[in-house]
């Protein structure tokens, strides 16, 4: 199948219908549930419920039935060192991004459905049923929030005047200048008066939601290390279609693969040179190279 703009739009609409008709109602029916049973994926703060697995199964069944030649990568069925992103059309799915939020009843979790071709995001739909926020895009067809085209207002993009999304993440081992120490020192560099002295930072607790809020212009940027392709694939497409860019979280990484695991999302609403200057002013505050 040739992935023309029309085919990409069809996939986008398939994602939207699946999320609105099946996944959203299922997630909402469990909202506020007291989850007494969940797994610790990596440690005590990286959580997964049986609902994550059920949702991924429903998504895979529906998408592979309609597009049997497309590959499928899901967070709950991913096998480290075995599952690879190839050049072929590949669904990249996170059934619940922000599971910890979901378990606590904090309304910032979503389902993230992405399609990649040649290793690049070409369709993305992110649905937060708790807030009824549906972000969607496909390559060449624009980006939308609840069917209204996202148009980021023109305004200067300056690091010191920016609002940035940052997250604590699940890797929190201190010492030996590992990733956790580097991230905490980077946050200090960005926030302190002697550093970048940015306006502030926000944490949605969901990579997909953070990227969508950058895409919509509510946030100026999002810096993260440690997330996975399924956390960023859908949002990345939405970001680019809204005029934003995705670069690496480490210094000088202008062109990164989907599974780089270290990202800097920068909003649109400005010229590309402003985005370039923003990245170049941001990177010196990163306190060491993140390694995953």
Swiss-Prot record:
Keywords, alphabetical: Hydrolase, Lithium, Magnesium, Metal-binding
Record EC number: 3.1.3.25
Cofactor: Mg(2+)
InterPro entries membership: IMPase, Inositol_monoP_metal-BS, Inositol_monophosphatase-like, Inositol_monophosphatase_CS
Activity regulation, per record: Inhibited by Li(+) and Na(+).
Residues reported in the UniProt entry to bind substrate: 75, 96-99, 231
Function field: Responsible for the provision of inositol required for synthesis of phosphatidylinositol and polyphosphoinositides and involved in the inositol cycle of calcium signaling.
Similarity annotation: Belongs to the inositol monophosphatase superfamily.
Name of the protein this chain belongs to: Inositol monophosphatase 2
Species per Swiss-Prot/TrEMBL record: Saccharomyces cerevisiae (strain ATCC 204508 / S288c)
